[in-house]
Amino acid sequence: MRALTPLELAVAVSLGGTVAATMVPTFLRNVHASRLSEPVDGLKRIAARATLRASGLPTESAYPESVAFTPAVTPRAELVLDPPGTWDAPTWRALDFSFDAPHAYAFAFESSNSEGHSTFTARARGDLDGDGVTSSFAISGSIERGAEPKLQPMEIYREVE
């Protein structure tokens, strides 16, 4: 096997650098996007179940009771595996929402029910880089007596914190 000439070596290094320069940002973007799918998909699941529940119940009991962020402490720069019972609150059971695998976000559900009008807001927050600044996601819905439930667009604050 012969040694590479300086020109061949320069071409190989240049080609390797070009491949790395295009592949690394794409890889990092895909990893980051996969982390963003957790709060978006989680809130979509919560909203879908809350809306389905509201369409079949009287307005004054359309949405389950509010529940604080679960887990109580927002994960910081790590995935957490919740101990048994973390997602056993009646609201999470009514919405059939929990995590069996490690996750990076905490979720909350806020509701207000009355005879003529009921609302909910589901929230997710996470601190992917552990700097104490959280990304926040929220989706809201409502139902008026005699009408179909409505969902608002998802709100995202500090998507990349």
Each PLM stretch: what is its role?
Residues V40-R45, A50-F97:
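Short, glycine/small-hydrophobic-rich surface segments
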Residues D127-T134:
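Acidic, glycine-anchored loop motifs typical of Ca2+
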Residues M1-V31:
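N-terminal single-pass transmembrane signal-anchor helix
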Residues A104-E115:
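Short amphipathic beta-strand and strand-loop transition segments with alternating hydrophobic
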